Amino acid sequence: MEPSPAKGKAQGRLLVSTSLDAKDELEERLERCMSITTSITNGLSEREANDALTAHVCKGPQQHEEVCLGLFTLLLTEPPQAQRCYRDLTLVNRDGMNVVLMKINQILMEKFLKLQDVCRTQLVWLVRELVKSGVIGADGVLMTLMKQIAGGDISSKNLWLAENVLDILVDQREWVLKSGMLVAMSLYTYLRLIVDHGTTSLLPLRQREVDFCIGLLRERFMECFIIGRDLVRLLQNVARIPEMELVWRDLLHSPQTLSPQFTGILQLLTSRTSRKFLACRLTPDMETKLLFMTSRVRFGQQKRYQDWFQRQYLSTAESQSLRCDLIRYICGVVHPSNEVLSSDILPRWAIIGWLLTTCTSNVAASNAKLALFYDWLFFNPEKDSIMNIEPAILVMHHSMKPHPAITATLLDFMCRIIPHFFPPLEGQVRQGVFNSLNFIMEKRVLAHLAPLFDNPKLDRELRSMLRERFPEFCSSPSPPTEVKMEESVPLEMDNHVLDKEDGCYDNTDATFSDDEEELNNKGKKREFRFHQLKETYIDEPSDITPFVDQLDEALKERVLQLQKGSDTETHCEVMQEIVDLILEEDFDSEQMSTLASCLAELFKSHFRGDVLPEEITEESLEESVCKPVCLIFRNLCQMQEDNSGFSVLLDLLAELYQKQPKIGYHLLYYLKASKAASGKMSLYESFAQATALGDLHTCLMMDMKACQEDDVRLLCYLTPSIYSEFPDETLRSGELLNMIVAVIDSAQLQELMCHVMMGNLVMFRKDSVLNILIQSLDWETFEQYSTWQLFLAHSIPLETIIPILQHLKYKEHPEALSCLLLQLRREKPSEEMVKMVLSRPYHQEDQFTTSILRHWTAKHDDLLGEHIKALLIKNNNMPRKRQSLRSSSSKLAQLTLEQMLEHLDSLRLSLSNTKNNFFSQTPILQALQHVQASCDEAHKMRFSDLFSLAEEYEDSSKPPKSRRKAPASSPRSRKGAAPQPCNEEESVSSSASEEEDSKPKASKRKRKGSAVGSDSD
């Protein structure tokens, strides 16, 4: 089982990398596990190897994980051994493949694009085998793999992945049909991909995709129904394909043939599409880049990011179909938090406007407009979200001045879609658009619509059509001065002033929102109308009618008691009875999902409002965890993990998590705040593994993100526990750190620093801190300063992170350079520090190297002189073409002789009018003389002023009788005066050293000059 050695590659065997990339932590870990595994089995027969591995995994959890990950890595990197490794893996694993599933999920979400081709092929093969074996959790992995199939991409790699995933779904059809979510996600994915596969060469693949989708729609329509209204949008795009047309006709005219429970297309169109489906059609990389633009990029500075995104994802004719996916994602998933509404972050409408204006295909442009208005058509204020309809009105509003054609096109589309979308439902569509416009005004997204609908920049025919369709919104507002003021704002630039006045939501924090999450944000600086919006939803009665009749009588009775009851104590008693019922042996597990839907609806008010008490005391904390939903947590804490009821309650929580994702961070809060849960934080890991995500890291990051969006105080409260309990998930990357520093204020930063200083919180460790600081270079200014302050609160030696200097550019990374500069000035320079400082490329405007060197000349001149001498002589002696290969500690450190001379010359100029005698030191003058003797004429001429210091030193070393003139002794009477660089004592010392170099016969001075003489030789 020993892997064949890598063929002369400096990079790892899993990921594609360059010599400049830092070693990937995940890759290092996996290769280390592979090495351990091969060392155990090396030279053994198959049976002996299996016995040895089995014995090793029995030693403990760590050894079990090492062997599982070692076999997993071997399987990815050694195709000939894959079957054997998988067989061994199934025999030795003790956790239902959980360790492997978690690693696959991590690789798919974080490293898939960097995987070597062989490893990518093997990973797909492994997923196929896991599905064949019916491993619990394989459906989650398969859905993550499907997410990597990019829309609008017909490259060979993407087609290969689409075809292989389809093979798995078709070959394992019976297994697929057991998971309703997998059925829906597969249908959503391949209905979308069919659009991209219309060329002649791809028709065989498209036909297979069509057959697969029709099979799911015919056999499992109600599972497909959970997609919601976007299922109709996707079917419209493929309805011209003959086989699909038959399904489309049945959908419109014979709904009962698809399912007895399906009443008609209106039932589907009034159902909102979950964000899970809208997000599944963006690859993790696309999603990351889009979230970066909507959460980190300032308005007005977006062009270079948009250009990059355009080149990467939207540059081909086929990729135009991706625009509707992006717009649906922005409208339905990327929702702003209250804390950033007044910031200058790039708003959603600006990105959508850019996507519309850069579209090069008429069909794609039409689909993009439909994607933008899709939630308008059947909008119901009681069920749908203002956040989904807001971008369209703001695109039109803000485009009126700079791009009136865009506004006109969208208004025209809005008018014409009413009669043409589906004529039998024209009345419902008109009502939906009317509801949208009315809700927009009610929530003051815009103060008035008349300036938009009756604008003189619109042509007469369009204005007439708008007045005819929407007379209610075309009357002039009162008082007219308000409209005049609003119109005077330069919309294309000063949109944020207008946003504050009109209550716009468009400065997003790029958060993943639940269906109701937009109502629950906890921004403190909000106008009262938004608090009213929250109250409206809180007072809304819970509607559990669709679910409650599916429960058995005992459960139904308790659930109805919960609905009728009002006080918390009664709710808790009933909830305990429900828990007791589901723990009974005869409980029907098929009711779990329905029960979770009821509980999520009944307890939705528990997930609004602040979780953490204003004043934190033992009593207030205990009181805060006395909600009915916390009874599930408490029962879990009281059980042993091997108890059968433990897994049942985890299943209930996992179902609840699908309906209400906020339950994740509520569980974390309970485990920290409740006395009953003391020392039970590991329960969260069991919960994460029980969810559809099946991955602790992903689950934890999503829950902390949800917490960040809802309650920053709670985020800070949880932070010490999360870092201490889950170090492998929190310390290996900067993901959680970025969440924290993105929202904390200066007081919360100081509080976290105190936790670090007292030893309650560790946010960095030596092996990963450098990578995290490098990641932070792309963050905002305050986020970077906060990160550095937290780093400095730790007792990590500066040498650990000094290689970051190689990544810092003086124009792009002033925050990191400032923090490093202040820290370096407190340090005593080591040779490695000096080397890294001098390794920075020389720019006249970049004063970093000169400033720290100058500071060190004042505080540690002797030490600095010795280090510079050693580096100068070492680099001067190196073969010129191989300097970078001889670097002592960092692949990035490419210290060249020319760089050193440039920085020293800059330092010389900086010190020229001071009394600093740094350049009169013997080591410096010896080194300069050594370099001058061997460098070429071009360098001698370029650095002549620097080398002249050594020449003057050489002249002063001659016998007294050969001195030129009496004034040569004048420095004695005016020590340190410019431009003379050295005092009398240093001259004598220098003379003594240099005389050894120039006149070896003077044996009495040999001791002082021996080091230089040896180096020169």
From Swiss-Prot:
Residues 952-1017 are annotated as: Disordered. It comes from the Eukaryota. Its main location: nucleus. Keywords: Cytoplasm, DNA damage, DNA repair, Nucleus. Coiled coil: none annotated. GO terms for biological process: DNA damage response; DNA repair; mitotic G2/M transition checkpoint; response to ionizing radiation; RNA polymerase II transcription initiation surveillance. Residues 983-997 have a biased composition (Acidic residues). The keyword DNA damage applies. GO terms for cellular component: cytoplasm; INTAC complex; integrator complex; nucleus; SOSS complex. It is found in: Nucleus; Cytoplasm. Pfam families: HEAT_Ints3_C, Ints3_N. Component of the integrator complex, a multiprotein complex that terminates RNA polymerase II (Pol II) transcription in the promoter-proximal region of genes. Component of the Integrator complex, composed of core subunits INTS1, INTS2, INTS3, INTS4, INTS5, INTS6, INTS7, INTS8, INTS9/RC74, INTS10, INTS11/CPSF3L, INTS12, INTS13, INTS14 and INTS15. The core complex associates with protein phosphatase 2A subunits PPP2CA and PPP2R1A, to form the Integrator-PP2A (INTAC) complex. Component of the SOSS complex. Belongs to the Integrator subunit 3 family. This is Integrator complex subunit 3. It comes from Danio rerio (Zebrafish). The gene is ints3.
